[in-house]
Every structure is written in structure tokens, then in C-alpha cells.
């Protein structure tokens, strides 16, 4: 009897264990199915978002593309056929907050002058019909893709010629590489996805505009062009992320289009082996030797380290490398990018003795403040970028300058 009860109890325990194990297995399978379904739904939703994003981005690009091409073509024709008829060269003294001729005679150097610069210098307004697609981009990306676009929807610059006429002597090109049938070309725009409206879509056309103005103003102060190669692309029309072959092709375009106006790293270095050696000697070239010239600087974002590796001597390169402060010991670096003027002010003792060319941003559209402007004027930077430069377009908006001038001496 006892044995029977024991066996019955043992069987019950065994059955209970089997039942619990079976339920656990069943529950595990249910959880697995829920996880699998959740992942499927997530990836389907992600695919829908990405597809919607790509469709909207492509639509914005193509809406702006035709207008960009037509604008640049008509602008170059206007300059050639109308603007320069009876043209009077710009008086460089009129844009300088100092006696220019005296400074030239005294040998004032490139790094002893501050130039007012524009940021994303080819910026135009997106076509109105693109806004619905931009809002779609904003929606499907939860506001991430559009960035600050809607804050900047009224932000635009004069043409490059207009900026040069207003005394701007430093401009910026954000550049995308495009490959078609093996041929590499370059497009200038702030952002291929949401901000592709530009007055200078084709790089060669942009350089042609600069060279044409330079030819009509042969004794102008040096023009500094900051080039930022984009590290991401929209998979459309053969756009590619910058690589070694793209940068080599870019240098070739600069040499072809700028010709003897290009003031190369080799021109700047003279007999020095590196920019570090040249800076220690505080021997940047005098302005007088740079009149009528164009200096091209490669922005630290993207490709600088690989660009330097192509030729560490910089003798065959077309652009002067820029770096961030933390990379200041790079021997080939001539420029430092300090986007925040307060950082440059905090490091002012370093910049006073290191003899770098420094680029900072005085404002960021639509935001500006007198405090930041004061820091920009104090920080010893030679390239001071503003989104509120003197201009013809939108004259009702705020304007920043050096008390009415666009070039000033730096007091070290």
C-alpha cells in the first residue's frame, strides 16, 4: 500500500515536472514568435522609412537640380555679356580698415590680416515646390534628416561675384564628387539631401566665376577658398564619397581652372620643409606677393590625413591642409578650424605664438549675438566667417562686418 502511494506520488511529481517543462517550452516558443514578429515589423517599418526618405530626398535633389543648372548658366552669361561691360575694378582700399598701401609697403603678411568670410558661399533658397518633400523627410526621419533646414529656409547669399564686390575675400565650397562613365566631376552644394539649392552647382563654373572677377581686378587681396569634401552621399546620379582618386582629380581641376592664380602650398612654403617650420619662423608670405592670387584650403572634415599622405612634402599638392586644435602638431598643417570663437579666445596665447591661420565662425544663421561677435573680433582669427555678410539680397536682415569694412589688421 505504501509502495503504491509512493509510486503514485512520484508519478504525479513527474507529470507535474513534465507539464511545467512543456509549459516553459511553449511559453519560450511564444516569446520567440513575439520577438520574431516584432523584429519583422521593425525592419519593415525601417525599410518603409528609408524608402520614403530616399524618395523624398531624390525628389528634392531633382527639383533643385534643374534650377541650379539654369541659374549658374544664366549668371555666367550675364557676367560675360553684361556685368563687365564698362566695369570699374573694385577699390581694395575701400574694404580695408587700415591704410592698405602702407601695409603693403611695410610687408604686412597674410597671417597678420583678418578677412571677413562667407559660409556655404553658394547657398540659395530651395525651390518652393520642394518644401512638401522636405517636410516628408522631416516626418519620416523624426526631424533628424532636415536638421536646421527650416530655421534656414530664408538663408541665401549673393552670387560669388556679388560677394567679391562687397569685399568678401574668403569663401567656402562644400563639394560632392560625381562619377559618370568613369569621368569625375564635382558639384558645389551645402547638402545633397536637404540643402542642394546652389548658385554654383558645377565646380569648374564656380572657379570660372572667381577667375573672371580676378581677371578684372588683377591687384585684389588674396582670395581664400575653404573646401569641405563631403563624407556622405545620396545614392543618385553617380555621387560618391571622396576617395584618393577623387581628391587627385580635384587638385587637377583646381590647377586647370585657376592656372597661375593658384597660390599653392609650395608657393607658400618657399624654402621651408614644412608648414610647422615656416610657422616657427613666422614667415607667411607678405600680402604684396599674394595680390591677385587664390589660396585653397582643405577643410579638416573628411580627407585631410589621406591628402597629406599623398605627398607629405606638400610640394605637388594644390591645397593647404587645415586641422582641428587637437591635431595642431601635424607638421603639414597651416590652418586650424576653430568654429567657436570662445575656444580661440581661450587659446589666444597659443595662437599668438604658433602663427597658425585660424578660421572661426562669428555666427550661425539664424542666430547671432553681440557677445559672440566680440569674441570673434578678439580671438586673432584670420578667417572670420559670417552668415550675415554685407550683401544685396535681403538687405533688411542683420549685417555683420568690421565696422563697415571686410578686411582688418590683427593686433598681436
Spans of features found by a protein language model:
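N-terminal Sec-pathway targeting helices
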Residues: 24-46
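Short, positively charged and aromatic/hydrophobic N-terminal segments
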Residues: 5-7, 19
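General helical secondary-structure elements
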Residues: 7, 25-29, 54
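Catalytic cores of phosphodiester-bond hydrolases, prominently lipid phosphodiesterases
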Residues: 19, 35-38, 46-412
